[in-house]
Amino acid sequence: MQIYYLANIPSPPQGVWHLGPVPIRAYAMCIIVGILVALWMTLRRYTARGGNPDVVWDAALVVIPAGIIGGRLYHVITDNDKYFCSTCDPLDALKITNGGLGIWGAVALGAVAVWLMFKVKGIPLGPFADAVAPGLILAQAIGRLGNWFNQELYGRETTVPWALDIYYRVNESGEYAPISGRSTGEVIASVHPTFLYELLWNVAVCVFLLWAHKAFKLGHGRVFALYVAGYTAGRFVVENMRADDATLIFGLRVNVIVSVVCFVVALIVYIRLPRGQETPEEVDPARSTDAGDSVGTADSQR
């Protein structure tokens, strides 16, 4: 009796389709789906804590563009040799649909933008950050599928049964086009599917955050701190498996160093933040104001 096993994981034959003259890019679609999922989860979680759903929509208008800009800036800065060399086209730095969004920059600039908005509006950031965290890392997991379609950010060559086959892709002119082209069926490498490793890790962290939030009644931003610690722990391992070129500092990939720093900072922040959860009135200060106005109106009518 013979037993047959799956012979490697195939890459998609292409990552771009055309609807007439309009290109439909899988990478962009994965980002959009991830954003929608994160928005849906944040709405449910924030309103369950007593937050105003309008706050989520207002924050989305700020954090989404800020996150995309921050993510692209981080990528371009840390991989500047891909865009600013003698044979490079600097305008490629603007082509985000071709891949290249650094999560560190996205979270950092997005967080700063939301913090400024909440400070102006007088809304506490902690409850919102805790509501965002599980949906954010699930969105990151969905976004990793975009790397699969783009055949990018994979690991070193391997012979494990779950290796990812990278295809030779060409455009309509027959020229090599690894992102926008279509597969010829020729496998040029079998590699560690690091996109899948990170995807699965992110889903596991999402489940853990949902459980920990409920089991330990976490609040005041502690869920978000756990998100940062959990994500960076996995990213540290996966980053060391990747084979793509990266900026090195002291011989280490820049994202490895950033992962270590963020992990340590997240643990310190988690320990220093208050225990327990905020009351609905603390989550949405407008509640207490409205309640006070209602009492004052009722007293004046007596």
Curated annotation (Swiss-Prot):
Source taxon at top rank: Bacteria
Physiological role: Catalyzes the transfer of the diacylglyceryl group from phosphatidylglycerol to the sulfhydryl group of the N-terminal cysteine of a prolipoprotein, the first step in the formation of mature lipoproteins.
An example Gene Ontology biological process: lipoprotein biosynthetic process
Protein name in UniProt: Phosphatidylglycerol--prolipoprotein diacylglyceryl transferase
Keywords: Cell membrane, Membrane, Transferase, Transmembrane, Transmembrane helix
A Gene Ontology cellular-component term: plasma membrane
GO molecular function list: phosphatidylglycerol-prolipoprotein diacylglyceryl transferase activity
Listed EC numbers: 2.5.1.145
Statement: the UniProt record of this protein carries the keyword Ribosomal protein: no
Family in the record: Belongs to the Lgt family.
Main location: membrane
Topology of this chain in the membrane: Multi-pass membrane protein
Species per Swiss-Prot/TrEMBL record: Corynebacterium aurimucosum (strain ATCC 700975 / DSM 44827 / CIP 107346 / CN-1)
Pathway this chain belongs to: Protein modification; lipoprotein biosynthesis (diacylglyceryl transfer)
Subcellular location: Cell membrane
Region (Disordered): 279-302
Regions that span the bilayer: 19-39, 50-70, 98-118, 191-211, 249-269
Enzyme class: transferase
